[in-house]
Amino acid sequence: MESIVLIIAAFLTSFLSAVIGMGGGITLLGIMAIIIPTGYLVVAYHGIIQLVSNITRTTVYRQHIDIPIIKRFFIGLLPGLLLSAAMIYGATTYFNTLSAADLKIDFLKPAIGVYIIWFLYLKKKKKAISKESYKWMGVVAGIATVFIGAMGPLIAPLFINDKLKKESIIATKAACQAAGHLGKIPIFFLFFNVSYLDDWSVLLPLIIAVYIGTK
């Protein structure tokens, strides 16, 4: 029953993101956090699913990608991912654990909950932004995608306030998010021992669902 709920949720949320360019990822994240008991698996699985969804949207709207924005975002994203990896390594070293999965405190689920509350109730409308903001937001997104899972609500105001066309928002934002989700795969593989291939029976139906929903 839980698998069916996740498959339906994956399809509907990917369809939502395909239509308006945002909102689907964090909705799916919240549903997965309720059903899947372990926080790091929520983020790891969600990352793979959203990687497929975002790559599909990027491909469909590829002619509308804003390359200069992506370049600025990538400049900040890589340091953000490296900083995330360094923090996880530091935590495992400090607590003397073989894997980050062995950390006694499951901090990821509370972080997801706080993030969703912020997105729904506390987020304020941003004012006009500069082009350099994409670099700094890349750093923040590199941390958020690892420790929370969904960075869409963080970076969405940049695209909206940049007055891009709808198609450009969908394509460029999807490309940025895809890069973040791709970048965290080795982090969860190395530090949390997440074996994506061993979990194919869980992930494959969800991946197919988001692909169909996006198309």
Each model region followed by its residue ranges:
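Hydrophobic faces of alpha-helical transmembrane segments in multi-pass integral membrane proteins
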Residues: 8-16, 20, 44, 48, ...
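Hydrophobic transmembrane alpha-helices of multi-pass small-molecule transport proteins
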Residues: 75, 79-84, 110-121
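Membrane-interface alpha-helices at helix entry/exit sites of multi-pass transporters
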Residues: 39-46, 67-72, 163-175
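C-terminal ends of transmembrane helices
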Residues: 53-65, 118-129, 157-161, 213-215
